[in-house]
Design a protein with these regions (language model features):
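Duplex nucleic acid-engaging cores and interfaces of nucleic-acid transaction enzymes
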Residues: 9-15, 19, 47, 51, ...
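Residues immediately flanking
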Residues: 20, 64-66, 157-158, 202, ...
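Electropositive, glycine- and tryptophan-enriched low-complexity nucleic-acid-binding patches
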Residues: 16, 20-33
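Non-catalytic, peripheral interaction segments enriched in hydrophobic/basic residues
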Residues: 242-288, 292-296
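Conserved polymerase palm-domain catalytic core
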Residues: 29-191, 196
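Extended C-terminal regions of large enzymes
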Residues: 276, 285-352
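A conserved non-catalytic segment of reverse transcriptases
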Residues: 100, 176-244, 249-251
């Protein structure tokens, strides 16, 4: 269970003040390969950097999984690291007090002898300060290291080199930084192994045109599952609010994953989602008389509308009927608020 610090308004203000003082000190000191919690850097930049290295021949990855990273930061090590660059001891002591301020677990506040309480402004910065030691060490060794918070990928040009890296990086993290590496989840893998290489929700692929970023299958599954939930017959009792929720979610998802090559996948999900929305509308019409009236109003011949309206077939089947597709075509659904994934993807992806 994740431990959360619940800072008061005063604590939060103080944390923000300390953070504002430390950011100008540490930003120039952080490694180029660190992407999490930095101004003007993102997860998209991180996966594009992995892609860039892969194009240079670094096609084997060491994927490191840290067990409960934020909860297990060693206070003594962190305070000593801070003292290297923070010359005002009062600031260091304030941070020390913050680290030991306690966290809430199952509604009970417990003392903290290790870890950085999540939920405050300061925690992300301290997490980066701690792992910057790791970043700089492997930078000195000439190893490409890409890190987003506690998601770490080291890159090598051969499997053998990656296996040596897994051993040496695990040793450094556990012995020097007193962290726990999850041995079962940490591994060496080809960056093109779609099932095994997953970084920040992305994977890499290659074809005759070169190397490209793609959405990992698990991320696709989660996306489709959420769309299915938002477009369920229960959720869609009122269609316009449901379309708005789908739009907000899908737009955020595409803004994140828009760098990936996924035209065929998006087209497939887009068609499936249109079908789902037609099904919801068909269910909303409920009575055969209402269905008949609406179909005729939308241009379906009366005799055909009567046959469809009185059909006992299931919603999913009828909503894929040619007449229903024509009556509830893309243009009409878009005018009603449908967020066309294919069009949105094209406008986002063109920037990459």
């Amino acid at each position: 269970m994740r431990k959360l610090g619940i800072p008061t308004v005063v604590d939060r203000t103080l944390q923000q003040a300390i953070t504002q003082q430390l950011v100008p000190i540490y930003e120039p000191l952080f490694a180029e390969g660190s992407y999490g919690y930095h101004p003007n850097r993102s997860a998209k930049d991180a996966i594009l950097k992995v892609k860039e290295y892969a194009e240079q021949g670094y096609t084997f990855a060491v994927v490191l999984d840290l067990s409960k990273y934020f909860d297990t930061l060693n206070h003594e090590i962190l305070i000593n690291l801070l003292r290297k660059n923070v010359k005002d001891e009062r600031v260091v002591q304030l941070i020390k007090r913050y680290l030991k301020s306690g966290v809430m677990v199952n509604g009970v506040v417990i003392d903290t002898e290790e870890g950085s309480p999540q939920g405050g402004n300061l925690s992300p910065l301290l997490a980066n300060v701690y792992l910057n030691e790791f970043d700089q060490e492997f930078l000195k060794r000439g190893v490409p290291c890409i890190r987003y918070a506690d998601d770490i990928v080291l890159l090598a040009k051969s499997r053998r080199a990656s296996e040596r890296l897994l051993e040496s990086s695990t040793k450094y993290l556990e012995e020097r930084l007193k962290l726990t590496v999850n041995r079962e989840k940490s591994r060496t893998v080809s960056v093109f192994a779609i099932r095994n290489f997953k970084f920040l929700g992305f994977a890499l692929g290659r074809n005759g045109k070169g190397i490209y970023a793609r959405v990992h299958p698990k991320s696709w599954k989660k996306f489709k599952s959420r769309l299915k939930e938002l477009s369920s017959r229960k959720r869609c009792q009122s269609i316009k609010p449901s379309l708005e929720k789908i739009k907000v979610y899908a737009r955020g998802w595409l803004n994140y994953y828009g760098i990936a090559s996924m035209k065929n996948n998006i087209d497939e999900i887009n068609g499936w989602l249109y079908h789902r929305i037609r099904m919801c509308i068909w269910k909303q019409w409920k009575k055969p008389r209402t269905k008949y009236k609406n179909l005729v109003k939308l241009g379906i011949p009366e005799h055909y509308a009567a046959t469809i309206a009185n059909s006992r077939r299931k919603y999913w089947y009828i909503s894929n009927n040619k007449a229903v597709i024509w009556a509830l075509n893309k243009e009409r659904l878009i005018n009603s608020g449908f967020y066309d994934l294919a069009t949105a993807y094209q406008s986002v992806h063109v920037n990459y």
